[in-house]
Each structure stands twice: as C-alpha cells, then as structure tokens.
Amino acid sequence: MTTQQTQALSLSDVRKQYGDHVALDGVSIEVPTGSIFGLLGPNGAGKTTLIRMVAGITAPDSGNLAFFGSPLKQGDIQHIGYLPEERGLYKNMRVGEQALYFARLRGMGRSEAEHELKNWFERLEVDGWWNKEVSDLSKGMAQKIQFIVSILHKPKLLILDEPLSGFDPINAQRIKTEINRLRDENGTTVLLSTHDMSSVDELCDHVALVNNGSKILEGRVDLLRENARAGRIDFKFKGNLIAFTAALGASAILHSVHSTDNHVHDMVLGIPPQTPIEKFLKWATQEVDVLSCSPKSISMDEVFLRAVK
C-alpha cells in the first residue's frame, strides 16, 4: 500500500448522514498524485456528497480527509478547481466579466486573470464570446466557459462532475484532450465523476466505485480489468466444434460460441489463472486450425456491471 504522503487526496472512514439517509457509510479512498481518478456509481450512490466534501461545501459527520498528506482545511480550497454537475453561471452578466469575477474569487490579480483567460479562450476557440451575454450561450457553450473558470487558477486538484454532458462529440474530445494535457504537462490530479464509461476507459488510470453509500471496489484500471477478465480469452478456430469441446474437457470453461457455415467458430473461453495463454495456444494448435487467440477485452462498463450485481 502506498503511503498517505504520495496521495493527492485521502478519505479515511468518512461518514455522512442526512436525517435517516446515510449518504456515505465509512468510505475510504486514496487518489494518487498526478492521476485521473474516476469516481463511479449509479445515481444516489454518494458521489455528489463525496465531491461536495472535498470541495469544502459540506463536512463529514466523522472520518478524515487529507490533501497532499495534511488534513484538508479551508485554505486548501484555493488549490482545488471544481466543475459541478449543476452549472452555475449568472445569466445577466457578460461572459468575460463573469470569468474575471470567478478568477478574482480564486485570488488572481486582474492582469494575470486577463492573460490566462485570453490563452484559454483562444485554446478552446471561444475568444469571440467575451462580450456575449451568458443568457445567449447554449448549454455546450456555457459548459466550456465553466470548464475554463474551474482550471484558470492552475489547481493542484481538479474535480469534474459529468464534465462532458452537453457537448457534441468534437468538443467532448477537445475537453478530454485538455484533461489529459493538464495531467501530463501541469501534473494536475483529476477527480472525474461520470456515467460515461467510454470516458473512463479513455481517460482514467484509477477508479473507485461507490454504491448505496459504500465503496464497492477501488484500484488501477488495468488491474481491475484483469481481475474481471478472470482468465477469459477470445479464441477463433476452424475445425470440428464437437471434437474440440470434447478435447477441452475440464481444462477450460466454454462461456460462449458463435459458429459460421464454413466451420469457423468464435469462442469465449475461461482458462485457469495459472495457465499461460501461450501454453493453451500451443496445445490448441495441435487440435485445430487456430485463427486467433487473445485475452478478452474487458471494458469498465463490464467491470461496473459485475461489481454492482
């Protein structure tokens, strides 16, 4: 186990209750520094409560939160960027005026804020929006502005709650690119809450899954996929299906098979964890004409569904 000092964010046995509803029940999570950490779970799982604690909006009833190895305190909020799911731009202000207002709230001087805003507005191709009324912006346009506002002060930890909702595919990909760039170039740690599992597959290196206020699983994405794979392989061959399945015996589990008229069969097989795929392939080539053999690809969607069953 890595030590707390290597973590951007640590939650230890955190609990929060609203009346009779337990929103978080003894949740412990560690977010490694410089990671893009996916916070997953169905609606009502406790994700928003957890995020609001980290952002300093609410406090836990019990448990501890640490920010880069020290107890999270009010002053740390200046080093946290937060894009909430419920967008919060003021409709009756101009875009540039409002962006400057939020930058000043983060402690930035006017000249520094104007310089950074100019760079970001150009990068995200919104430099023509400075004098627009916020009320004239589409959902996707407003989302871009709020994304800029959340990262303008170069936070050490960036919290993104459903950051891609409201974007078309082109702009969603642009935001994904910026999230990766913030991590790779600035060393920003990102806490990403989303229902979009394709984004988790594309962006996240670590995840935690919460459900009904409890943590169900946590870990590196590659290791969670490997565990969910459970020795399953995609195996395609040409030959006699009945003879091959008989030869398999107890050495592998047949999960599924799809056959074509020319005696080509696509299988999903489960081989024991202690059996290297190379050893299985060497045996199989003596039995049938092997067309392909590879570890089964497991998406985070499958990991999620298996965990909450």
PLM regions: where:
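Non-catalytic surface loops within mature trypsin-like serine protease
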Residues: 33, 128, 237-239, 271-273
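A generic structural signal for secondary-structure junctions
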Residues: 68, 107, 146, 226-229, ...
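ABC transporter nucleotide-binding domains
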Residues: 6-9, 16-211, 217
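Pre-NBD coupling/linker segments of ABC/ABC-like ATPases
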Residues: 2-4
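C-terminal coupling/interaction segments
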Residues: 272-309
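Solvent-exposed beta-strand sheet faces enriched in polar/charged residues
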Residues: 12, 236, 294-296
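ABC transporter nucleotide-binding domain
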Residues: 177-270
